[in-house]
Amino acid sequence: MRQNKRELIQAVFHNEKADRIPVGFWHHFLQDEVGADAFSHPQLTEKALEGQADFYQAFEPDMIKIMTDGFFGYPHPLLQKAVDSPKELMAITPLGRESEWFAAQIRYARKLVSIYGKETPLFYNLFAVPRTIEFMQAGIGHPVNLSDWLKQEPNKLAHVLDVISDDYAELSKALVEEAKVDGIYLSVNNISCDEVTEEAYRTIIAPYEQKILEAANRVGGENILHICGYHGFHNHLSWYREYPFLAVNWAAKVEGVSLSEGKKLFQGKAVIGGFGQTEKDLIYSGTEEAIKAETRRLLDEAGRIGVVLGADCTIPRDTPVSHLKWVREAANE
């Protein structure tokens, strides 16, 4: 009997033989996924749910990344105004389990699990705390350079990250334990590829990202690390080799690091991706012949164990679903 989607992803994430190659693509559903505030405007959650439903019906993905459009923020009063230094955040305290920030996300995840979870594994998107701070400050017209914070006030920044990541760790645990998602999909990046040293990142940033993954691991989460290369952002991938995840997705096209190279870099962990994610890339603009040829090339290069075919990051909203189906067809000829 052929593996169902749950058995398929379980096998791939553990580098076991699978009946076929799974395919996982995703895109945003709200027009302003970063600035949208579903905590204050819960109707946005319904729009996101409708978007997930339409995409699932059209494509029937082998795994679902729960898109958290509207939930990018951390609605703490201290972060909802312009901040110029981490010392302005030293009084920050966790929002806690009783907050709407916490409860709304559990409700949202539970709803999706109740609809799709019986047959398809779901992974809840969370952003690491530095990315959340950047999103929130940019959203009020006050972009911040966290690499400056890291250089000028490292201990104060560490304190802020520690406090907020406590909330994210508790949320990740509850998403797995209570909402019954299969794992979290944690999005990280280097903050600044050129301005931040590896030592500073490992000391000040990494512990509070790893904390989130570790919390989900403790309750059985099968977790994914996403090293975000959106808009061509470059990362030092090796900085994440020791993070506690089962599968990893990075911007293979942007970084110039193939799936097989990434598999070696990340010590044999399962890999997700292969295709670029912009309107200039093949998955959006390619012909059936070209997309199928690239699918075969990716698998010839990466092998068929521990591989999920997908993209560097979210694909454009209007990517033809037929293009995604061509990948699945070619992968399983």
Per-region residue spans from a language model:
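N-terminal basic, low-complexity leaders that serve as flexible interaction/assembly modules and, when applicable
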Residues: 1-80, 107-114, 202, 206, ...
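Catalytic-face loop-and-helix region of soluble metabolic enzyme cores
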Residues: 8-18, 32-35, 210, 214-333
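N-terminal small/glycine-rich loop or linker at the start of catalytic domains
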Residues: 14-40, 70-71, 76-78, 123-156, ...
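Active-site mouth loops of central-metabolism enzymes
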Residues: 35-47, 146-170, 223-227, 279-290
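Short, acidic/polar
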Residues: 43-55, 164-174, 233-239, 289-298
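Glycine-rich, proline-tolerant flexible connector loops at the mouths of alpha/beta enzymes
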Residues: 63-86, 90-98, 182-199, 312-319
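Active-site-proximal, glycine-rich beta->alpha crossover segments in alpha/beta enzymes
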Residues: 76-174, 202
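Alpha/beta enzyme core
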Residues: 169-184, 210, 300-301
